[in-house]
């Protein structure tokens, strides 16, 4: 396809008030948001788990030889579980950084947007 000429490109910039593309839907915000699932986040304790499995492999899967690595992994997983509990408590109390999609939809329905263009 041929490249647009310089005159054609300059003609678009000459009239800044007129949009270049015509939207297929009106540019109005909706009164609800999509109900999507939250991201699960990254996996925790990967390093401890890999150290534990490497120890098992070296010691032919004997728990007695890898007692320290197993304990480190269990400690890390319990800390991660406590952090998840605290985060869920903060979200339920409304102290989280962002609102859930359900709460956002409730707020948008309480304070709806104008449904016509100004």
From Swiss-Prot:
Residues 42-84 form the CHCH domain. InterPro entries: CHCH, Cys_alpha_HP_mot_SF, Ribosomal_mS37_met. GO terms for cellular component: cytosol; fibrillar center; mitochondrial inner membrane; mitochondrial small ribosomal subunit; mitochondrion; nucleoplasm. A motif (Cx9C motif 2) lies at residues 66-76. Signal peptide: none annotated. Transmembrane segments: none annotated. A motif (Cx9C motif 1) lies at residues 45-55. SUPFAM superfamilies: Cysteine alpha-hairpin motif. One of its GO terms (biological process) is mitochondrial translation. It is found in: Mitochondrion; Nucleus. Its main location: mitochondrion. Residues 89-99 have a biased composition (Polar residues). Disulfide bonds join 45-76, 55-66. Residues 86-105 are annotated as: Disordered. It holds the Pfam family CHCH. PROSITE patterns: CHCH. Belongs to the mitochondrion-specific ribosomal protein mS37 family. Component of the mitochondrial ribosome small subunit (28S) which comprises a 12S rRNA and about 30 distinct proteins. This is Small ribosomal subunit protein mS37. It comes from Mus musculus.
